[in-house]
């Protein structure tokens, strides 16, 4: 399938440029490491704000990884070739989003035990963090891909990209923080997780069409 071939191609290209994969992950760990040093040794304060720190670090590290999503394909002309394949453009866009999540969102989930250790998170809060990252990071990848598709033709689109996508990240951040707060209070958080899951399903279903339309606009201009 062309869909799987595109994912494989994206992973192979990323492995050749491993710095672009590792930099956001290092940034994630750096933010999580520095926050406890800044706020001091108060364990109560750290336990109260630590879950939010983890999600803010994940959001910022995601921003660092977005620009390369369509940039190289746009520069070398392969993006136009992908648009001419037999596969519909929304499916091509979804394949690139899946590859982006495998390279950025999944590693953040795998790094969450280290984050929990650095932030002294309890096991139940760490598990809630894993669930929110599992449901929330695909939404970040989908929204970020729409922003990248709109700004891919601009020379300095990084600032504009941030202005476009960060406000759209806020609902994910709010519900993820609500889940983590509920986990800290040992109260049920199934409702918040269901909303995050609905966001993920909606983003994965609808964003490929928005990305495809944005790419056509960018290439036409």
Curated annotation (Swiss-Prot):
Main location as per UniProt: membrane
Q: Which UniProt keywords apply?
A: Cell inner membrane, Cell membrane, Cytochrome c-type biogenesis, Membrane, Transmembrane, Transmembrane helix, Transport
This chain belongs to the protein called: Heme exporter protein B
Q: Which cysteines are joined by disulfide bonds?
A: none
* GO molecular function annotations of the record: heme transmembrane transporter activity
Instruction: Offer a single GO CC term for the protein.
Output: plasma membrane
Is Metal-binding among the key words of this record? Answer: no
Instruction: Tell where it localizes.
Output: Cell inner membrane
Q: Which gene encodes it?
A: ccmB
According to the record, the segments passing through the membrane are 21-41, 46-66, 101-121, 126-146, 157-177, 193-213
């Amino acid at each position: 399938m062309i869909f799987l071939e595109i994912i494989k191609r994206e992973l192979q290209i990323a492995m050749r440029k491993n710095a672009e994969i590792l930099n956001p992950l290092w940034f994630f760990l750096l933010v999580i490491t520095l926050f406890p040093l800044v706020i001091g040794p108060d364990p109560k304060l750290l336990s109260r704000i630590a879950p939010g720190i983890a999600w803010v670090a994940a959001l910022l590290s995601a921003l660092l990884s977005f620009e390369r999503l369509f940039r190289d394909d746009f520069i070398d002309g392969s993006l136009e070739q992908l648009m001419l394949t037999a596969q519909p453009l929304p499916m091509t866009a979804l394949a690139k989003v899946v590859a982006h999540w495998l390279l950025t969102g999944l590693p953040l989930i795998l790094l969450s035990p280290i984050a929990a250790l650095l932030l002294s998170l309890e096991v139940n809060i760490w598990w809630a963090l894993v669930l929110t990252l599992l449901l929330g990071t695909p939404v970040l990848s989908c929204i970020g891909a729409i922003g990248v598709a709109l700004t891919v033709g601009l020379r300095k689109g990084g600032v504009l990209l941030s202005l476009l996508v960060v406000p759209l990240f806020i609902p994910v951040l709010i519900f993820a923080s609500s889940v983590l707060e509920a986990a800290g209070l040992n109260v049920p958080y199934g409702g918040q997780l269901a909303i995050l899951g609905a966001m993920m399903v909606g983003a994965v279903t609808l964003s490929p069409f928005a990305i495809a339309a944005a790419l056509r606009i960018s290439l036409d201009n």
